[in-house]
Amino acid sequence: VDSVTYAEFFIAALTEPNCEIVLNVDPDEKTNSIIIEETTYRLVFYCPTQEYYNDYGLNTAERKNAISPIGILEYNDRKIMLTGDSNKYNEPLVMARTGKIDCDVLKVGHHGSETSTLDNFLDNYSFEYAIISCNAAGNTFYHPRQDTLDRLKARDIDVYRTDNNGNIVVSVDKDGNIKITTQKEWDKQANYVGLTGKPQTQTRIRDTRMRVFFVVKERFGN
């Protein structure tokens, strides 16, 4: 999708030394996937087909979200799923291509919207942790939505949220151990409470720098 933000990011990436640019407009013909494979990790992006682009159209925000490629990062027998703004339309397409597999960590689609992270999607991948990136204030969409959080809670998936926990770092070490660290204190039950129906003037601290980081640590030797 064309945007000024994407154009600026792409130009910045081109200026990085030794940076290989891989575009999802030219995926593998057999799998329609982008595979980046190194000796220590494997990253697979499941991209929409050209026919999907042609038939689906991009005339609404929902349709634009439905072309988000979903990626799975594999490292030391651990799997982390990255979903962008994926929703109920492209989640089934990815499930059909991966089959039923276990994934350890989910970056929840579309900031925890109720149109993403549906029951059949969660049951297909058996996640243990869920990471939600959402604003701490000025959140007019009330993300994450309660319906989404209820689905995660029903499966006892530990939820981490940038609005409650600040910066979140997910690390996988050389032995495959997962460690999640947060800028602010983590409260399991508090993170199951959504913003649906709450007034927009919340008593939360706005932090525009809140981010989620995924780190593989073998190269650092610990």
Language model regions located:
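Non-globular, low-confidence helical/coil segments that flank catalytic cores
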Residues: 1-222
